[in-house]
Amino acid sequence: MLPLLPANAEQPNIKCPGNNTPEMRWCASKKLQESNSALEKKLPRAVLMEWQRATKVVCAAAKKPYLQGTIYPQLVVGCDDHLNRALLKEFKGLGD
């Protein structure tokens, strides 16, 4: 699932986690962009693409019960971000 923002969008004045659905979606997309950027620095492009493909499939399956709800896109984006951040923790050293 792609981030929920246009590529050239100005950053709105939103305090995350947001007060309504559009703000919460914006915050979830922002967090996903941040974790994707961090992974781009850690993984070769081909591996990152495979990871993103896999997390999209896994998150879509995990959130399938909410498929017909308006919250579904936000849940999938949040799931993708959580998995990204779990992987990023694996790159930390023992002393971190």
State where each predicted segment sits.
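N-terminal alpha-helical modules
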Residues: 8-96
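N-terminal signal peptide c-region/cleavage motif recognized by signal peptidases
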Residues: 4-6
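Conserved active-site segments centered on acidic
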Residues: 1
